[in-house]
Amino acid sequence: FSPIDRYNDNHTQETYEDREWENVYRSTHGVNCTGSCSWKDGIVTWEGQELNYPTTGPDMPDFEPRGASYSWYLYSANRGVLWSMWQEELQNNESPLDAWKSSWQEVNELIAASNVYTVKTYGPDRVAGFSPIPAMSMVSYASGARTPDAHFFTEVRVVSVSPDFAESTKLCDLWLAPKQGTDAAMALAMGHVMLREFHLDNPSDYFLNYCRQYTDFPFLVTLSKQKGDQFVADRAADLVDALGQENNPEWKPVLWNENTNDFATPHGTMGSRGKWNLEQRLEDEETGEKLSVLGIEDEIGTVRLQLADGSTALVTTVYDLTMANYGLERGLGGQEPKDFNDDVPFTPAWQEKITGVPRELIIQIAREFADNADKTHGRAVLNLVLLVGAQGVNGGGWAHYVGQEKLRPAEGWQTIAMAKHMNSTSYFYNHSSQWRYETVTAQELLSPMADKYQHHGDYNVLAARMGWLPSAPQLGTNPLRQAGMSPVDYTVKFAAEQPENGKNHPRNLFVWRSNLLGSSGKGHEYMLKYLLGTENGIQGKQGGVKPEEVEWKLSSTCLYSDIVLPTATWYEKDDMNTSDMHPFIHPLSAAVDPAWESKSDWDIFTSLSKKFSEVCVGHLGKETDVVTLPIQHDSAAELAQPLDVKDWKGECEPIPGKTMPQIHVVERDYPATYERFTSIGPLMEKGIAWNTQSEMDLLRAWAALSEFTGRDHTHLALNKEDEKFRDIQAQPRTVITSPAFTGSEKQSFYLDHDMMKDFGESLLVYRPPIDTRKSRPEVEGKEITLNYLTPHNKGGPIVWISETDARDLGIEDNDWIEVFNSNGALTARVPAGMTMMYHAQERGGIHNSVTRPTHMIGGYAQLAYGFNYYGTVGSNRDEFVVVRNINWLDGEGNDQVQESVK
């Protein structure tokens, strides 16, 4: 390379020196960032960006990743520190065993013996493994810089929405700073403005046509009267029996056909099992999908019709419901706002009191956002994007940074991956006993018209029993010991019902590609106390037991592990990477051999499976196991529970795959574990039309999918059948796009599941931050309670508070302070010469997150569990904490080392 590197758009970057290399390998940082590295004499010499990505279209800049560097991990002194310590200890003890370092062979045998004992004594599902984000290195799973976005920052108007002046804010045109946890109110007010001005006052044809074709706005919803004159929106598909539908009538929502002035059900909804509906057709004719019943109504905003049983019902459209939900004045009377200055829910004036953002700014940004989308046809939060037709349009759409990254080539990848998959959020919530510390009951979050379970833990159990979510351990007994018994005899007792029974506790836990205790587990101190039984910093009261006071120290998963195995980094193994952030499949290439004694994850588990197969002989042979599987998304089973939520414990019969999980009897040949681990089995021959004598025939599969959906999809996979791993090493390839199916087969504004209605979330609503009230411990001295926002910009062990709060507390810049609540505590300071520590590495319980019962819904069209798709998540959330000054640490020689007890 010359001293000046030239990149896309003809800009350059000085490199200051010539570089020499022997080979160039394409790899990545391993998370979202993409790039390449080169090596010389077996050493990675430098890292730089690659530019030969496929084009993203003529109206978008070419992809230009400026990814993060990883070589500092590769050659970190930490990788050799244990080796150095062992060598030093070896000089004193002479014996390598006394020097506490083991060999791969010994460790494999120890782990294998432990697994055999656990499987034999407690059951196979008491052995667990945890690894996050399969898409970031999918082969390793099966065995942070966001600077790329800066390339698209030019020539666009960027608005930052952040309670604090974040790093990204300084690059934006406008900064909206809502109070923590109130951004939903701001977004709803923007939606109010858009609907008022671009749907009602001056309707945009583009917006209305988009909503008609690509959203569930035209579908009809029944209204039932409850508690006096109050009406409650009910299921969207309760009318279909009157239309003579026979096949899955409960899954075929109804709309008003303007062409015939009658009710109709389009093909392509979930009841049609995959038929495409975006062409707005009935079986044999075009539909004119009416957005609103205004103008044809029998009563205010509704139409009354007669059902097949002779009764009558009031119906309206999802569009009309949404208008009412946003508080739009449409001449129907009632307490509707006259303009944006009325203090009525969801108006700009209403949100101003909640968020602190001036109403004028909300009106301005909403108008500019919608006007731009109207003029450019979508090149512009999720509701806002749909209202202006900006989803699925190049240059528009909704992008997010947190969440689950999509593993794109799942069909082929699953043939070598997966044991019994578990949703980790519920798993760690149950086994770390976080349900013990809930201060807000489910009843307090429910709609006043709902009467369901009282506790968050109850929803986890309900979801496991009904087959909504996977559960591990599955059953309250070891299925290997129940040979000869019918699975029905012992599968009605789920382990989730008694998570603290010693027999239902996880025994062996493998963790790879993750700092589970520091970040991924969500609930650090609870995991230390209940999952591991070690020292912890929980300060909340539980059952009257006062938590212990502990010495604060840095925590990580390795520090609490019995065995630590050295693994290869992203530059030392071959793998693949996909992301929501870009449409490419990117390789990770082995530029150098694994350093020290490390091995790739795949090689580690291969050697473990080989030793396990040897050790289990005489203890485990061919055994009969029972596996429960949740009702899966994108399968016929997702139509299993169309109506009420009924628990088979007292409300209906237990029917596997219908009212409870699917139950499968599986033969485990434990001595053949290694042979099976290193082979591709017969499952690749199954599917809708796969031909895998040598490899999967992609075009054949897509031809079958085209016949299934009624649309030609083969062009999406053309020229893909010959692509190999070496091809993406030369240049990343674009992924194959495919349709996703929902209940209405459109993007949904309205969700009619019973649990969504119970929690009042069938339509978008604003929920203020939850006040946990008495959850904090008692303190003495001057204090202030703040609404603490979990930092998202990856800061270190420092805390920012306002100047006003600091003055009230007597805190100055660079002081030691203590931040604590019932989940734990942390201390923070920024002394001179201190380096920054990235988030998720420090101990202190800052990653204690809640989940939502509505994420547990299953067996209901798109609301059905699927791997890497849908399930409970540990959400980023607001938290109330106490901050107090601890300046007694200064002047006592504690600037660098904090005493454990004061």
UniProtKB/Swiss-Prot annotation:
GO term, biological process aspect, one: nitrate assimilation
Reported cofactor(s): [4Fe-4S] cluster; Mo-bis(molybdopterin guanine dinucleotide)
Entry's EC annotation: 1.7.5.1
UniProt GO cellular component terms: cytoplasm; oxidoreductase complex; plasma membrane
Upregulating conditions: Induced by anaerobiosis, there is no significant expression in an aerobic environment. Expression is further induced in the presence of nitrate or nitrite.
Record carries keyword Cell membrane: yes
Annotated source species: Bradyrhizobium sp
SUBUNIT field: Heterotrimer composed of an alpha, a beta and a gamma chain. Alpha and beta are catalytic chains; gamma chains are involved in binding the enzyme complex to the cytoplasmic membrane.
PANTHER family, alphabetized: RESPIRATORY NITRATE REDUCTASE, RESPIRATORY NITRATE REDUCTASE 2 ALPHA CHAIN
Binding site for [4Fe-4S] cluster: H29, C33, C37
Keywords: 4Fe-4S, Cell membrane, Cytoplasm, Electron transport, Iron, Iron-sulfur, Membrane, Metal-binding, Molybdenum, Nitrate assimilation, Oxidoreductase, Transport
Protein name listed in UniProt: Respiratory nitrate reductase alpha chain
Disulfide bonds: none
